[in-house]
Amino acid sequence: MFRNSYIQQNSDIQAAGGLVPMVVEQSARGERAYDIYSRLLKERVIFLVGPVEDYMANLICAQLLFLEAENPDKDIHLYINSPGGSVTAGMSIYDTMQFIKPNVSTTCIGQACSMGAFLLTAGAPGKRFCLPNSRVMIHQPLGGFQGQASDIEIHAKEILFIRERLNTLMAKHSGRTLEEIERDTNRDNFMSAEAAREYGLIDEVINQRPA
């Protein structure tokens, strides 16, 4: 039911020399095996792992929409471990997170850098978390283009537009002023989990689940 959604993640894990664990469920109908990610999706858990790119973004958006259709009133949990990636791919995930009815809780495991940090901060207010040894990094969008001077100018204007839009949204979700965001994203800005909380990118650093 869910397995095809994780073909890319499974392939990435296998390429790194690992195997995707399988879990077996027993019911009155017999046994059924799931890969671990598909089983967690049944619990409304989505993983955003690795660089943010179009194929991954399409899978994340599809899973968000599917879980909304399953239950529009129950939270979705998005776990993020990403170095960042494509702005347009990331914005498709962001827009879907804001569009659907369920709250999307975000949790950083490992790292949330660049677009990963932006999506972490875009979680539902009060439901944005980091594990204690996570790292968060914010910066301005990167871009490069070769060609005629007129084309370079067009792309430079687009990058400036994207930067302003990202900064505006980051200010909205973090509670910081636009001027602060512009200043603090001028260069790579790495933060500990606690520093990310103080800055407003997340709401809480969690060491373990509540009893």
Swiss-Prot record:
Please give one Gene Ontology molecular function term for this protein. ATPase binding
Pfam families found in the cross-reference section: CLP_protease
Active-site positions, per UniProt? S114 (nucleophile), H139
- Major location (coarse): cytoplasm
EC no. given is 3.4.21.92
Localisation? Cytoplasm
- Alphabetically ordered keywords of this record: Cytoplasm, Hydrolase, Protease, Serine protease
Sorted alphabetically, which InterPro entries does this protein's record hold?
ClpP, ClpP/crotonase-like_dom_sf, ClpP/TepA, ClpP_His_AS, ClpP_Ser_AS
PANTHER family xrefs: ATP-DEPENDENT CLP PROTEASE PROTEOLYTIC SUBUNIT
Return the similarity comment.
Belongs to the peptidase S14 family.
NCBIfam families per the UniProt record, alphabetical: clpP, PRK00277.1, PRK12553.1
Q: What is this protein called?
A: ATP-dependent Clp protease proteolytic subunit
Q: What is the lineage of its organism?
A: Bacteria, Pseudomonadati, Pseudomonadota, Gammaproteobacteria, Pseudomonadales
Q: Per UniProt, what is the name of the gene that codes for the protein in this document?
A: clpP
